[in-house]
């Protein structure tokens, strides 16, 4: 009898836990995807080889001012 009650309680708890977890993972995946997307459209057209993209502008200094 006790085992049956435990199983029912677990089944009742699962949708809430699963919903929370999936919401967290979806949010995480969404932020990862949007991060990739913004990184891709920073410089259009892409910078020539040897230059890095910073805030939409191409720069050939690898360790220049990060605060710009």
Swiss-Prot record:
Q: Where in the cell is it found?
A: Secreted
Molecular function terms from GO: ion channel regulator activity; toxin activity
Extract the signal peptide range. Answer: 1-20
Give tissue specificity per the record: Expressed by the venom duct.
Q: Which residues form the propeptide?
A: 21-68
Modified sites of kind Methionine amide: 66
Q: Which UniProt keywords apply?
A: Amidation, Disulfide bond, Ion channel impairing toxin, Neurotoxin, Secreted, Signal, Toxin
Domain comment as written in the entry = The cysteine framework is XIV (C-C-C-C).
Function, as annotated, reads: Probable neurotoxin with unknown target. Possibly targets ion channels.
Output this protein's name: Conotoxin Cal14.13b
Per the UniProt entry, what species is this protein from, by scientific name?
Californiconus californicus (California cone)
């Amino acid at each position: 009898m006790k085992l049956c009650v435990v199983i029912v309680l677990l089944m009742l708890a699962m949708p809430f836990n699963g919903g929370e977890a999936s919401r967290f993972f979806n949010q995480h995946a969404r932020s990862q995807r949007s991060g990739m997307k913004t990184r891709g459209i920073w410089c259009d057209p892409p910078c020539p080889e040897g230059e890095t993209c910073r805030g939409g502008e191409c720069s050939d200094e690898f360790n220049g001012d990060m605060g710009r």
